A protein has these predicted regions:
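Conserved HGGG/HGGXW glycine-rich cap/lid loop of the alpha/beta-hydrolase fold
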Residues: 4-50
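Active-site loop/oxyanion-hole signature of alpha/beta-hydrolase fold enzymes
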Residues: 41-81
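Gly/Ala-rich beta-loop-alpha elbow adjacent to hydrolase catalytic centers
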Residues: 82-90
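Flexible "cap/lid" loop of the alpha/beta hydrolase fold
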Residues: 95, 101-133
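Conserved alpha/beta-hydrolase catalytic His-Asp/Glu region
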Residues: 115-117, 136-193
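Short beta-strand/loop motif that positions the catalytic acidic residue
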Residues: 195, 201-203
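Acidic catalytic loop of the alpha/beta-hydrolase fold
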Residues: 205-210
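Catalytic histidine-centered segment of alpha/beta-hydrolase-like enzymes
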Residues: 233-245
């Protein structure tokens, strides 16, 4: 695991747990905006890129993140953001409560399956094969993720997809298998730790059906969590393709408490 730090001069801290299957540079613009206000710690998971190590599990990742934060003297976080696999990691991080978080955004976070083992294994096999097909075929990659939608304005889609295709080929078979098994089968305590964190769960309007079980899980596990639908967005689209809108929305949530305090005056 690697940790990229930005805005280190700020006192306020924000943990940034990205989704899988995207290189660290896919989040540069959004992280850059957040670093105007926060000391941002962006996690790069094992097995993502040429790290020389395989991704093991959500549990291992959360332990490593916790150890890194504690080793660097961070005993409390002002904010945390996790998307997809990162949302799974953030869900467990919050549930354990070893490092309190004031406000957290779980963006389309994956939650544990609640179905028989055989069905979970079949789902993992489906996801594993789907990833391998996308990583192997440029045509499939561009069909599933059309460049005209998934390339930011002003950037060269050919160069970006060349880089993305090369990046996806760095994932080992073990990493891919572990990602899809662990993201959907990680363990949680029966009840989450009580630490007063304000949690919101984001999901794109165009992925609502796909996130249905995740939304139900979050509502049950974190009863006080707010739900926030992002209009006209698909999975992880806001944070990667619309950094200014992402920044506006996340800062509106992260600064709610301060705004209310200022109004009370």
């Amino acid at each position: 695991m690697r940790t990229l730090e930005y805005g280190t001069g700020h006192e306020k801290t924000l943990l940034f747990l990205p989704c899988t299957a995207e290189p660290e540079w896919a989040f540069t613009d959004s992280v850059g905006l957040l670093s105007q206000d926060y000391h941002v710690m962006q996690i790069v998971y094992d097995g993502h890129g040429e790290t020389g190590e395989d991704f093991i599990s959500v549990e291992t990742t959360v332990d490593e993140v916790t150890d890194w934060l504690q080793a660097h003297g961070i005993t409390r976080l002002n904010a945390a953001y996790g998307c997809s696999l990162g949302g799974a990691c953030l869900t467990r991080f919050l549930a354990l409560g070893k490092i309190p978080v004031e406000r957290a955004v779980i963006d389309a976070g994956i939650t544990p399956y609640r179905m028989p083992l055989i069905l979970r294994r079949l789902a993992c096999l489906r996801d594993d094969l789907g990833f391998r097909l996308i990583a192997k075929s440029r045509k499939v990659l561009e069909t599933v993720y059309p460049p005209e939608r998934w390339t930011m304005p002003g950037r060269d889609p050919v160069k970006e997809y060349d880089a993305l295709a090369a990046y996806l080929k760095t994932y080992s078979k073990r990493t891919v298998r572990n990602i899809f098994w662990s993201a959907n089968n990680y363990t949680l305590p029966t009840k989450p730790a009580e630490m007063g964190c304000q949690i919101t769960y984001w999901y794109g309007e165009e992925e609502k059906q796909a996130r249905h079980s995740n939304i139900c899980f979050i509502k049950q596990y974190f009863p006080r969590a707010q739900l926030h639908k992002i209009p006209k967005m698909d999975h992880a689209e806001l944070v990667m393709m619309y950094p200014q809108e992402f920044y506006r929305r996340i800062m509106a949530f992260l600064t709610q408490a301060q705004a209310a305090q200022n109004e009370r005056g």
